[in-house]
Amino acid sequence: DGVTYSPINTEFNEGSLLFDFFYKKVRFHIGCLFIRKQLLEENNLFFDEDLRLGEDLDFIYRLLITCDMYAVPYYMYKHNYRENSLMNSCRTITHYRHESFAHERIYSSVMQLYKGNRKEEIHTLLSQNRAYHKTRYLWNVLLNGDFELLNQLVESNEKELNDCNLSGKRDKRRAKILASKNYILWRMVRLVNRKKNKR
């Protein structure tokens, strides 16, 4: 049966909404958008089927880059999540991996598609999102105790961790711990975290 999802949108938005959406000045659900089928076909705008999470966000970004649009304060449809959907299941390391992959893909597709004069601004915004989700995924690999996998992931993302432009102090600290590639430190962090969770 799944879970019915019907969030509430309260405003009518129109025009070029890309940066308002980036900065969360406007918020709308994909079910509030009027989209011509012809526009989708002409611009090859479809959901990325490789994404298990974040496919709606990726689609909305690409749509906002392509055209001005209307977002109405009503939900045109409801959708049900499958019973085994990632969206209504407990958070696991799989969630974090798929989120990290989604934000990698979003960064690539948006940077490739956007041709305006604010590309550096978009790069900064999406790089922060990408770094945040990647750090969160790697941190959960650490907490899971899979240090061999973690070491491989850190090595393949070493430059990004060292050049990290994360905004939060906690996230910056985590990035430094991950980038250290210090197995003893990683084990200590995991041990402390497990003790905290047992309290």
What does each of the following model-derived ranges do?
Residues 17-18, 121, 149:
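Exposed alpha-helical structural elements
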Residues 75-83, 89-118, 136-161:
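Catalytic core of nucleotide-sugar-dependent glycosyltransferases
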Residues 1-4:
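Conserved donor NDP-sugar-binding/catalytic core segment of glycosyltransferases
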Residues 9-96:
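Conserved nucleotide-sugar donor-binding catalytic segment
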Residues 138-199:
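Membrane-interface aromatic/basic loop that binds lipid-linked glycans or pyrophosphate carriers
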Residues 124-140:
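Amphipathic alpha-helical repeat scaffolds of TPR domains
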Residues 57-60, 103, 107, 130-135:
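Hydrophobic alpha-helical core bundles mediating ligand binding, dimerization, or RNAP-core interactions
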Residues 115-125, 165-169:
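Short, surface-exposed acidic
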